[in-house]
Amino acid sequence: MPVNDALAPSQNGADTRASDAASRERPLALPQRPTDVDFDAVIIGAGVSGIGAAYYLQRYHPTKTYLIVEAREAIGGTWDLFRYPGIRSDSDLHTFGYEFKPWTGEKAIADGPSIKAYIEETAREYGIDQHIRFGHKVLAARWSSDTTTWTLELERVADGERSEITCRWLFGATGYYRYDEPYTPEFEGRERFRGTIIHPQHWPEDFDYSGKRVVVIGSGATAITLVPAMTDRAEHVVMLQR
């Protein structure tokens, strides 16, 4: 099933952009709702991978039904969640982006809002946004060998209401770390610190660091983008590296 090749070139090596344009112009076979499950496929996550998987599912299996389940209220995944100053990609978008919709932005190393807009535009252009159930998270996924089906237990984030859906094929596009519980190391004496401690993964939108003395702990990709961006208003910024 070619869905897993979401970021790979076509198997015959040909440029797929012309065929993509043609496929948008001609009528596609209409999806046929399966009789024994709710959907043929369910994709968990509406970030860059989830939208890519949906595109290839539509392209190679246009008669199959599918649903994208997204816990947040917006498309984008990481690029909707992270709001810290200087947020940008670590890889160039010509490589990181979709081969069926090449990146045309001015900067190859793009900022977070531009990447989010690119993913949203892709979802709209191919009608993928019409297949997303926002504000629902997957609590459990149970496989039955007897019926060859997945049963997913969902929870509506707004009020905790639970429901179940079934499918034949399940694709996890949730990323590789916990969005709700970022890793935070233990620091002795942390409770005695009288300043503000912020994890970049949950950056407050209204936080004003103007005139503040800032210490950034760590020197990874997040710190490398965060430190230069904060020097415009902060009084002093120091990076600590172990």
Please place each PLM-identified region on the residue numbering.
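Rossmann-like dinucleotide-binding core of oxidoreductases
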Residues: 31-38, 42-43, 48, 52-55, ...
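Feature captures the FAD/FMN-dependent oxidoreductase FAD-binding
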Residues: 105-178
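Glycine/serine-rich phosphate-binding loop and adjoining beta1-alpha1 elements at the start
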Residues: 1-29, 161-196
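Glycine-rich active-site loop/strand segments that organize a redox cofactor
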Residues: 76-121, 242
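Residues in well-ordered beta-strands of folded domains
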Residues: 99, 153, 199
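Short, solvent-exposed coil/turn elements at secondary-structure transition points
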Residues: 72, 101, 138, 144, ...
